Amino acid sequence: MKSYFVTMGFNETFLLRLLNETSAQKEDSLVIVVPSPIVSGTRAAIESLRAQISRLNYPPPRIYEIEITDFNLALSKILDIILTLPEPIISDLTMGMRMINTLILLGIIVSRKRFTVYVRDEGGGSRVISFNDNTIRALMRDYSREEMKLLNVLYETKGTGITELAKMLDKSEKTLINKIAELKKFGILTQKGKDRKVELNELGLNVIKLNKSVIESSKSSEELVKENKGKEVNIPY
């Protein structure tokens, strides 16, 4: 079971597309939040949605109207709804008022629930991007200095094999394999080829950008690699 949590404007097309592309089932939950008082255009779109949902075997919508006069009061109402919903939560930020969509996005993130959020081309094109709770968790995580040294070596070398990485960091291959497996769970590393070369993906590169201060406060990985050629460099995990 999954929960759809969205707002809605004057057209139900994007929502129907979301339900179709994510294989919505009747037992799922569909919650639509709209600003109060609801306007006639949105009301008409909701009625059209109800008519189509009844024949498509999608979940019936529950409609919530909320007043938006204060950020914290509005966010509180959003959280009251989100926190009761089963996971994962699915949302599409292409529909309705930007103000409501902003509150929905913030509410979903701070709720710490599992989620996937979609953003589509408002012009009706095929472009769509998405991200989920794993993405946010990877970006917001407090990485240790030692983890950042490892990630920065991968950044500076543009990826390397386990054996070479172990030599650079003066660590056993087993230790690094375990650490890399741990970091891969956050979706920031990939391993390719016969030699299982370890590389940062785009998400990993964003983690590097967000943690530059951690990297710059310690020796650069370039210096680390150079020093390791002549003497031992011990970096405890």
Swiss-Prot record:
CRISPR (clustered regularly interspaced short palindromic repeat) is an adaptive immune system that provides protection against mobile genetic elements (viruses, transposable elements and conjugative plasmids). CRISPR clusters contain spacers, sequences complementary to antecedent mobile elements, and target invading nucleic acids. CRISPR clusters are transcribed and processed into CRISPR RNA (crRNA). Homodimer. NCBIfam families: cas_HTH. GO terms for biological process: defense response to virus. InterPro entries: Csa3, Csa3_N, WH-like_DNA-bd_sf, WH_DNA-bd_sf. GO terms for molecular function: DNA binding. SUPFAM superfamilies: Winged helix' DNA-binding domain (SSF46785). This is CRISPR locus-related putative DNA-binding protein Csa3. The gene is csa3. Keywords: Antiviral defense, DNA-binding. Belongs to the CRISPR-associated Csa3 family.
